[in-house]
């Protein structure tokens, strides 16, 4: 748990950037959204310009999240500015290496067009592009940079640090490390991509099979976290893998789930099943994610901490409704409670299959064609679809499934924080941590009560003079803060369970 919280601390700022980026995108999206324009149309050029500005800035933030994560990790871990330069050199070395060494015969979604890096060297078929490695590539480079930084700080016989400065040596080491990583990824990525293509073929073989749609939804969320969801979204949203619709009157053939939904929305034609790949997002954004937020909030037993965070959680829930993208919340789950992320993915897969089984289909249309920052399943799209009489059955099914998923996610989250998070891997250290905390506080009789905040344990002390500060150094808890009422321990998601057990001892 300590390692998980250390990683969370390293990634806390990029997660905030993700939230802020989607706030900007949501503002721009709402102003330009056709669903909102049904109720009110913004005609001011200034407002439309601001919307476009926010949309593009937010898009740039989200598209470059892997680099932001990488830079923040190397800064936090090294507590030094020089790793930033090392990381950038290493990242571009890694990217260029994947461009020159990788197989260029994969689908276009397997390659990245970021930063405009390309090459026509020794490639007769066209331009070579780097592989789209997303978060995986950025984390590989981050830890390669960390290793290079540490390696450059140790002087050895015949080491280049005896000739060059430590920072220069670190850059050279990282160049070599990232070059090797780039070659390894160049030859292993196509194999992994082949399996993804098989999954896409498997899903596309029967677009009405609940299991296949469930697999799609789980893969979509996993690849979104990895920053690579365009690999699976583009084929189903915009190509024949997501279905096709032929207008017998005009002879027009429309490909892809999102394209079909958009076309049907603007015409009088009908097509059963359009929106199947978008429908689960309404449940995710409006019910499952709020269930996680409220479950986390209700798990805090310290009223002062809980009350101070209520506005923040309300804002996060509103953002989930409006922005229609669960990615920031999924980052929080990944870096604080992987168990909850797994439970969340299972729930997403099950509800996706269930919606198809009950023939509930509800799509979305948007001017945003970038699948990475697309916001399907927003409240604005949901409201506008309620007005369509032919969609009432789908809307009602989504509401029923959503309420059930909300309750399930709420219960799972609270159960995890209160019971499972305590000594999750069953190392036997959970009880020892409680004993150590009681000893630090000066004994059980010196504790008035215990309460849990967001990833922290608050111990209210009767006599501050009895606190054993020497013991804090011995047990190696990541962070302990002395407050006006006692001590605050940063214990991660196990804080709630530990607070409950300490209070039980106080009542015994």
What are the residue ranges of the model-derived segments?
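Inter-helical loop and helix-membrane interface segments of multi-pass membrane transporters/permeases
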Residues: 31-55, 96-132, 159-163, 193-204, ...
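Transmembrane alpha-helical segments and their short flanking loops
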Residues: 44, 48-52, 249-251, 255-270, ...
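Transmembrane alpha-helical segments of multi-pass membrane transport proteins and ion-pumping complexes
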Residues: 14-18, 22, 26-30, 64-71, ...
């Amino acid at each position: 748990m300590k390692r998980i919280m250390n990683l969370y601390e390293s990634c806390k700022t990029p997660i905030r950037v993700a939230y802020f980026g989607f706030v900007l995108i949501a503002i721009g999206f709402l102003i330009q959204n056709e669903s909102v324009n049904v109720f009110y149309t913004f005609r001011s050029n200034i407002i439309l310009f601001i919307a476009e500005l926010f949309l593009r800035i937010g898009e740039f933030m989200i598209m470059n999240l892997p680099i932001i994560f990488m830079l923040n990790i190397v800064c936090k871990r090294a507590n030094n500015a020089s790793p930033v330069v090392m990381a950038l050199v290493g990242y571009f070395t890694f990217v260029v290496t994947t461009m020159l060494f990788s197989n260029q015969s994969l689908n276009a979604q397997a390659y990245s067009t970021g930063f405009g890096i390309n090459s026509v060297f020794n490639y007769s078929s066209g331009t070579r592009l780097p592989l789209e490695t997303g978060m995986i590539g950025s984390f590989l480079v981050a830890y390669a940079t960390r290793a290079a930084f540490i390696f450059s700080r140790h002087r050895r016989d015949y080491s280049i640090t005896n000739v060059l400065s430590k920072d220069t040596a670190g850059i050279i080491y990282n160049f070599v490390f990232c070059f090797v990583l780039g070659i390894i990824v160049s030859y292993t990525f196509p194999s992994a991509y082949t399996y993804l293509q098989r999954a896409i073929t498997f899903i596309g073989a029967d677009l009405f099979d609940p299991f296949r749609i469930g697999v799609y939804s789980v893969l979509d969320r996993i690849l979104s976290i990895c920053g690579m969801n365009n690999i699976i979204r583009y084929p189903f949203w915009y190509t024949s893998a997501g279905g096709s619709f032929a207008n017998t009157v005009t002879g027009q053939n429309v490909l892809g789930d999102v394209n079909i939904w958009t076309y049907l929305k603007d015409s009088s034609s009908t097509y059963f099943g359009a929106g199947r790949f978008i429908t689960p997002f309404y449940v995710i954004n409006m019910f499952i994610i709020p269930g996680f937020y409220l479950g986390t909030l209700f798990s805090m037993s310290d009223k002062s901490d809980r009350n101070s965070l209520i506005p923040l959680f309300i804002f996060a829930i509103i953002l989930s409704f409006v922005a229609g993208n669960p990615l920031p919340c999924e980052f929080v789950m990944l870096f604080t409670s992987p168990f909850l992320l797994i439970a969340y993915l299972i729930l997403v897969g099950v509800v996706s299959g269930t919606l198809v089984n009950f023939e509930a289909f509800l799509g979305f249309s948007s001017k945003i064609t970038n699948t990475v920052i697309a916001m399907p399943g927003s409240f604005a799209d949901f409201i506008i679809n309620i007005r369509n009489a032919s969609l009432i059955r789908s809307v009602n099914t989504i509401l029923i499934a959503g309420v059930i998923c909300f309750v399930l996610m709420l219960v799972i989250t609270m159960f995890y924080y209160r019971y499972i998070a305590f000594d999750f891997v069953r190392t036997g250290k959970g009880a020892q941590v409680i004993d150590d905390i009681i000893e630090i506080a000066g004994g059980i009789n010196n504790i008035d009560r215990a309460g849990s905040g967001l990833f922290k344990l608050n111990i209210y002390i009767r006599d501050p003079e009895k606190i054993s500060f020497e013991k804090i150094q011995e047990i190696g808890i990541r962070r302990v803060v002395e407050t006006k009422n006692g001590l605050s321990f940063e214990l991660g998601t196990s804080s709630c369970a530990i607070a409950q057990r300490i209070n039980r001892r106080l009542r015994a």
